[in-house]
Amino acid sequence: MTKETSINPELPEESKAWFQNHGLFSDHFLKERLPEWKEWQVGKEFSDFRANLLALYESKKSILINMNESQTEKEFIQPVLNLLSYANSYIVQTDTKSGVKVNHPDYALYPDQVSKDKSYTAEGINYQNALGIADAKYWERPLDLSKSNERDTFSNVNPSFQIINYLTGTQKNWGILTNGRLWRLYSLKANSHLANYYEIDIVQLLLEAPDSASKYFYLFFRKQALLAGIDGKTFLDHVLDGSNDYAIELEINIKERAYQVVEYLCHGFSASYLPSELTPENLKDIYDNSLILLYRLLFVFYAEARELLPLSTNKSCRENYSLFKIAKDIAVITQSGNTLSLKSTIYYSKINSLFSLINTGDKSLNVPEYNGGLFSPQEHPFLDSHAIVDFFLVPAIQHLSRVYDSKRRQTFAVDYKTLSER
């Protein structure tokens, strides 16, 4: 067996994501590939936008918490839309004579004032030439809950359901949902219209993040993001295409690596046998259980990426018991070039402990019990009675946890969240 030589050993520091991407795009694409696009290279227009947005927030933050939906729109959301180049090019849904809004999106977004003015008809607003739609809620209103509050225009309505209904009704591909602080993008092009979205916390961006991180708001929510180019596609369309292309590339890469991972695992289990013991029956056991171990590892990588295991909500779980932490430690070991033991089974013990925790669950760590049998020692006793030494297991996990990005010419953590959504 030969060690992999095609991967650049450099281990870049994983950059913090100043966005919440729920399967709409690829995290890796957003963090590593998008900054190489020419659209990312914005200058004074961006710095002016950020300065104006910060000034707007600072001037309104003390009163926003007490405003109702209509007041939030007038005092904050509409000024933000103006900063995003939508001034004079959006239609605001008006109230009926009874003072209640009809069931249409709050905003229809147009490429210019001429297109906007042509969209007023006797039957109502014509959305045919609209770039997209937007819906607004009062400051910090939960966007995934139905609730009744006097600050709401509509009572007991789930805003995320609402925006999807509006997108479907208007047949627009892109929609914005905001409570002033959180800004979300939804798309009819997503695999799951409701579950997949892209979210920015503008307060966090303005007060905690580097200035450049605000590009993740500016580039994605400004009017130019919805304007089609000569190819008929918008900036958001291209980001979605780039994310999908990366996901396909990654899926092919992981499938190819799986064969080599099984080879590592088979060699690892075989090492505990005498040559005379490697009978056809034992070799079949080794191969079958190497596949089971591969499935376990992939299951946990996917589960952690999708927050089915509490990585972001439980620090103890993340730092002491997760495959994320094991893989992170292994990446450092691999990059340092340290010799791996042919006797130690430290890492096998670590993953087996994690598998046991998943099988039984752990309320103290908020880990739910998995009763599908994959992690059951009764169904797979071989994996409890055998072990793989670090020399074989460490590179196997490294192959599943880090991947070479041909465009960046570096290795990065595998974006399993992207794979899990496709």
Segments predicted by a language model, with ranges:
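Preference for the N-terminal adenyl/adenosyl cofactor-binding alpha/beta module
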Residues: 1-67, 138, 197-422
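A short, conserved, highly charged catalytic patch centered on acidic carboxylates
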Residues: 1-174, 189-192, 235, 239, ...
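Loop/turn residues immediately N-terminal
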Residues: 181-183
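Charge-rich, low-complexity amphipathic helices
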Residues: 98, 103, 188-189, 205, ...
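A short acidic (Asp/Glu
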Residues: 145, 185-190, 303, 311-313
